[in-house]
């Protein structure tokens, strides 16, 4: 598997997925206030409030800046682990994140997507810059040494493994998304199968205080 072809050729596919997400979102706007009267609307993800994991993260973004969860206080963080050469699960997750931001409208400014690579060997900062930019200018790709990635994965109970292929290797990995509230606390885990509406629903709840 040639890493260079993921730096150029798939960009059209990434852009196509992002554009499709934006169009879908425009056609089905998210009404964030539809459940404001409820004390605690039923969450679409798994409530993990108070979990003894997912409390720390320290990696480097695609611009070379060290990032921790403290940097995003005041925002809800969508945290996802994946890799650039992922054929469909990762680009689908990122395209869905674009839809989520569209549904949230002005509140999207208080949401940050963090994409942690589980393939630091191939996912260089330059490649992460291209990959993130293909979806949304605010998305941040995080990388580090193999040891740092392993530490982050353990902290969030993420599984990943290198799987040999005939021409190189691919990565097997968990596909859930973690929602971290504006105080930097892990609150919700959303499965990959959930829709953009499900994600927007739970994020909107966290933006309203999550209580």
Language-model segments: which ranges?
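Thiol-/selenol-based redox modules, centered on thioredoxin-like
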Residues: 166-211
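Short active-site neighborhood of thiol/selenol oxidoreductases, capturing the structured segment around
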Residues: 71-91
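Bacterial signal peptide processing site
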Residues: 35-37
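Thioredoxin-like thiol-disulfide oxidoreductase module
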Residues: 146-168
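Post-signal peptide N-terminal segment of mature Sec-exported envelope proteins
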Residues: 42-61
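A short beta-strand-turn-helix
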Residues: 58-77
């Amino acid at each position: 598997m040639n890493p260079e072809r993921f730096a150029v050729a798939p960009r059209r596919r990434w852009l196509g997925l992002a554009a499709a997400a934006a169009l879908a979102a425009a056609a089905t706007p998210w009404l964030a206030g539809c459940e404001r009267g409820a004390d605690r609307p039923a969450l679409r993800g798994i409530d993990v409030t108070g979990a003894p994991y997912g409390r720390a993260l320290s990696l480097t973004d695609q611009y070379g800046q060290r990032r921790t969860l403290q940097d995003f206080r005041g925002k809800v963080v969508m945290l996802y682990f994946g890799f650039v050469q992922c054929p469909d699960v990762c680009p689908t997750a990122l395209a869905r994140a674009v839809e989520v931001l569209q549904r949230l409208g002005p509140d999207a400014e208080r949401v940050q997507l963090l994409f942690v690579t589980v393939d630091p060997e191939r996912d260089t900062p330059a490649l992460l810059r291209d990959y993130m930019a293909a979806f949304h200018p605010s998305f941040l790709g995080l990388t580090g040494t193999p040891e740092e990635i392993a530490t982050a994965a353990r902290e969030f109970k993420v599984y990943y493994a290198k799987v040999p292929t005939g021409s190189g290797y691919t990565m097997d990995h968990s596909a859930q998304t973690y929602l971290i509230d504006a105080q930097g606390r892990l609150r919700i885990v959303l499965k990959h199968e959930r829709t953009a509406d499900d994600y927007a629903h739970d994020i909107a709840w966290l933006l309203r205080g999550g209580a």
